[in-house]
């Protein structure tokens, strides 16, 4: 039985990855995340079905021990894009160091271990035309989140022989439990991906290791997940209403998480066949879960008016 390690396992994507791995019934699963009330609650229901380790991916001793004993690593542990305003040293300490620990441990102790690394499509910067993985990368001023992703990609390519890098756009998650990315320019035309499709693709990668090895792909939801960012934001505010996270992003965050469309995203869909959801199906699920937020929806109306005005320019 193949052994799979998931870092950042208590997040939205991590829990879905666990769900899909369990449904396959052929993997021994280890979930790694920091110990706190939130992660404990998220992973508690899996206690008897998987191995749960509470610890920090920044801990080299812990990572050495785990990497030695696993065939695949799905490395989801990362800071959130909204934290890109933090000092560079802090972001690097939190984000890059964990990836560096994993790469070093694979190199020294388990070179055959296959790393599945989710990067970001924000590495392309603000491009008007459809982009591909061969396009030149770009770092926005002070966006340390993106800078670390680019540096981690380079580290993986230089040091490892068994890996795949997925550049992932904004993930449409359950926003009652996970942050949405609010700092994207309203008129950016972009491809999204739903959390279910993204997690399923990460799991299906294991079955297609030889086909994707040492490659980089844009992992998106395709044409049915393509829209202007403002259209998606407007619908989220109409369904979910106003939130403190949205207000915080509006006040403090620079609009430096850019959206793109992709000329080559079909390549990975042809291998994994993971795309099953659309933006509209995501909205339908969101509506079913958020029927009670009447006051929040009322408070969101001025912001929706402003977004509509910007979209119709």
Enumerate the predicted regions with their spans.
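N-terminal Rossmann NAD(P)H-binding glycine-rich loop of SDR-like oxidoreductase domains
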Residues: 4-24
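NAD(P)H-binding glycine-rich loop region in Rossmannoid oxidoreductase-like domains
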Residues: 48-97
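Conserved Rossmann-fold NAD(P)-dependent oxidoreductase catalytic core, especially the SDR/UDP-sugar
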Residues: 79, 100-142
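Catalytic helix-loop patch of NAD(P)-dependent Rossmann-fold dehydrogenases
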Residues: 93, 123, 128-165
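Flexible, glycine-rich beta-alpha linker
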Residues: 124-125, 143-144, 164-183, 188
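Substrate-positioning beta->alpha
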Residues: 165, 183-207, 214-215
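Mid/C-terminal beta-alpha module of Rossmann-like enzyme folds, strongest
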Residues: 205-271, 283, 298-299, 311-313
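Amphipathic terminal alpha-helices
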Residues: 279-313
């Amino acid at each position: 039985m193949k052994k799979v390690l998931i870092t950042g396992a208590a997040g939205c994507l991590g829990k879905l990855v666990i769900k899909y791995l369990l449904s396959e019934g052929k993997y021994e699963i280890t979930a790694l995340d920091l110990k706190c009330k939130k992660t404990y609650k998220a992973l508690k229901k899996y206690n008897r079905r998987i191995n749960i380790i509470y610890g920090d991916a920044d801990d080299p001793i812990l990572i050495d021990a785990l990497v030695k004993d696993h065939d695949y690593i799905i490395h989801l542990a990362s800071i959130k894009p909204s934290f890109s305003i933090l000092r560079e040293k802090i972001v690097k300490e939190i984000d890059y160091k964990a990836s560096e620990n994993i790469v070093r441990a694979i190199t020294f102790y388990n070179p055959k271990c296959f790393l599945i690394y989710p990067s970001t499509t924000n590495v392309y910067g603000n491009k008007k035309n459809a982009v591909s993985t061969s396009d030149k990368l770009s770092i926005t001023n002070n966006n340390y989140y993106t800078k670390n992703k680019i540096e981690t990609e380079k580290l993986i390519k230089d040091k490892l022989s068994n890996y795949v890098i997925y550049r992932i756009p904004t993930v449409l998650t359950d926003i009652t439990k996970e942050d949405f990315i609010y700092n994207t320019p309203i008129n950016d035309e972009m491809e999204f991906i739903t959390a279910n499709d993204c997690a399923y693709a990460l799991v299906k990668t294991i079955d297609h290791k030889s086909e994707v090895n040492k490659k980089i792909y844009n992992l998106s939801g395709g044409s049915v997940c393509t829209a202007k960012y403002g259209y998606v934001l407007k619908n989220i505010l109409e369904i979910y209403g106003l939130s403190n996270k949205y207000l915080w992003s509006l006040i403090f965050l620079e609009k430096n998480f850019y959206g793109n469309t992709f000329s080559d995203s079909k390549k990975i869909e042809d291998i994994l066949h993971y795309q099953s959801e659309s933006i509209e199906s995501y909205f339908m699920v969101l509506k079913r879960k958020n029927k009670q937020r009447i006051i929040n929806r009322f408070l969101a109306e001025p912001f929706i008016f402003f977004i509509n005005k910007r979209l119709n320019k």
